[in-house]
A protein has these predicted regions:
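Charged, terminal alpha-helix-loop-beta segments
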Residues: 1-166
Length: 166
């Protein structure tokens, strides 16, 4: 299910975006899935947790619109995982002594959010997402770096205004 915003195709809900990225973590970001919607406390839960081949925990925060709130969320989750011990078997491949990968994915980031991210988390990966239709009619979820270079993309199939994952 798609919507159009500022001339871009986007998934209609954050839940669809999250599910699609979760199911395609490896081809999109070279991460293995660890946990989705991990409860930090009653008010906070991390969207997606993954682990890279070196055992670093990746904390992903997704926004269907502007990524303004994602930086503070990533900071809270980084603090939580840095302090807590995790006996959950989902975390067995994670080396908590290694620096975490913090990734914010949104349809766009305004300049103040980008400046704030660079100040607070110098190595935070800020990625934009969009669904792009190519000339051959195929749709792809595209993740781009801030300089507009494509980091990764993966095919999706749209049938009768619905999203079919392939």
């Amino acid at each position: 299910m798609l919507r159009q915003s500022k001339g871009k195709f986007l998934l209609k809900s954050e839940a669809l975006l999250e599910e699609f990225i979760w199911l395609h973590l490896k081809p999109l970001l070279n991460l293995d899935p660890v946990k989705k919607q991990y409860f930090i406390n009653k008010q906070n839960r991390s969207d997606i947790l993954g682990v890279n081949p070196e055992g670093r925990l990746a904390i992903l925060e997704l926004k269907k619109g502007e990524g303004k709130g994602s930086i503070d969320q990533l900071l809270r989750y980084q603090d939580f995982f840095g302090k807590e011990s995790h006996q959950d078997p989902n975390f067995e491949r994670v080396d908590f002594s290694k620096k975490f990968l913090l990734i914010a994915i949104a349809s766009y980031f305004n300049s103040s959010t980008i400046d704030y991210a660079r100040k607070m988390i110098s190595d935070c990966l800020l990625l934009t997402h969009e669904v792009k239709q190519y000339d051959n009619g195929e749709y792809f979820l595209v993740l781009k770096k801030l300089d507009n270079r494509i980091l990764s993309k993966i095919s999706i199939e749209i049938i009768e205004d619905s999203l079919m994952i392939i």
